[in-house]
Amino acid sequence: MVKMSLDPVQVMSGQVKELKVAPSSNGESRGSWEAKEEFDQDHLGLTTKPKPPKPENAVTVAVSSRVLFRTEREQKVFEQKGVEEYLRYQIEHETEPFAPGPAFPFVKALEAVNTRLRELYPQSEELFDIVLVTYNHAHVGIRLINTINHHNLFIERFCMTGGSSPIGYLKAWHTNLYLSADADKVREALAEGIAAATMFMPEKLTEVSDTQLRVAFDGDAVLFSDESERIFKAHGLDKFFEHERDNEDTLLDHGPLKGFLEALGKLQKKFYAKGQRLDCPIRTYLVTARSAASSGIRALKTLRAWGLEIDEALFLAGAPKGPMLEKIRPHIYFDDQMFHVEGAAEMGTIAAHVPYGIAQKYTKQKTSAGK
Amino acid sequence: MVSTIQNTDVKQKDADRAVVVAVTSRAVFESAADDGGDVYGVGVAFPLLQALHKVNERLLEESSAESLLFDVILITTDDQQQQQSSRITSSTRHYGLEVSRFCFSSQEDFTESLLKNNVQLFLTIDRDEVLRASQNGVLSALLDQQLASCPSEQLRVMISGDAVIKPDTDPMPPGQKGAQSFSTQLGQMRQKFGIFNSPLSIVLVTLHGGRESCGDALRTLRSRGVSVDEAHCLAGAPRGPILSVLRPHFLLSDGVSYLQE
């Protein structure tokens, strides 16, 4: 067990303590107005912090510490030297903030949207809410909090499970989207009906917008079910086209990320209602291998029937997705096939793998998955 | 009238070092479905007692001469159960519960019993009893009947982060002092086990505050030698769903503690 030998005086000095008025107040009432003012000045900024929304009203995004920040070095310590050494290392480096990870730009963009939403609807709880969900031990908590402070992130909620599965907590937090580095946890979440994806650090990080959140989705097995992909994998391209043509007017079944697209759409409408369609800080993209003239029609009809608007639909008819994504520069791109995820990452796009559907049986990975 | 009976089946603990936890017999034994037999059914606090026992067992495994152990006493305030004191002792023996003493007192003077026995934590299913014990300076917590329905084998103690950050005020409210010393002892016990597979887990929950409160609580607890296993920061989110996943046995706050409000 890690033994702490911290001088309490050292620890306690320089701490910003929140002004607390507990219900069972110990009678320490700040009667004079001056005293209260003075106290507040010590806590500049705290009184202007907006109140986090109720999870069921918000679009809750749960991110793990390994995708929000870069923790490769620490991971190595854990793998090579075990948990005690890992925790010791974390505590030793407590005042060193982690560098941003693959989910960082996405989270920053969510916060930018929140700022715009609050301007237009100051009383509304229909906002993004970010929860840090990690199965790290609470020992790492202080370093994570220091890092959040350093990067000026607005994250007030977290869940450090100390080794137990985070899945139960995802449900308790009404999670709309879960991002993690651990493919197993992501699969578990998907099995529980929670939209989830595994994120990877791209080799180079292309710049993304800091005023407009851009989310790109693959179609089959992400927004839609994998039924068509099954046909393609089992019977080939011709059969796939035939099937899509024959079933053009039958809606596709929904996929794991449909709900998240829906949630984004709801927020978009709030901007449209205030005349900000052109200036909307949320933009969504469909990037699919389907063709506009044929198989794409069924996809569009399905989206329309679901009442979901997607801002740009890009039908690549089998062409590589990398260059298109490089132009779009999404904060996150969801695809069920590792092949596409890796291809995107190679070109600097932040891609997330949705381990769902038939494609998982045919993984053609270039590198080993999910660390 | 207050009376104390020692349980001769169980080895008595070191009075200076042991952590005395008093639980009401009404919480441990189910007297509702009374068939008049010798032995009571198990109640809400039964799994808690088993978890406390497990911690003791593991502490003794680490060091057979360990004296920092839980010392569990059963306190009976219920008039009905008092009349059947032998049934309480026989039920305790029947289940092999590690209870070192039985205290019998009336509703009026049970707090006297707590103070006499140097009780550091009092657990009950009765809100009034929690209030009264707290008012008399004894750290006490309400056992939640809902949460007890899916008990865990591991002793899970929840510490409220909103209470920890209170700066040391002078004079310190009596409940605060009790909470601090109890959590320090808990921290000492926790240190005897490794990161994984511990029979005791300390869970910090910040119900109202955000990350600043949580950070302060973590630092304060660490300065007292309390290493927290799990930390959850709710920042005002409804506590129900998260508590049912957390499944704490009880919540430590300062003075009056309620798991569910």
Label each residue range with its predicted role.
Chain B
Residues M1-E261:
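HAD-like aspartate-dependent phosphatase fold
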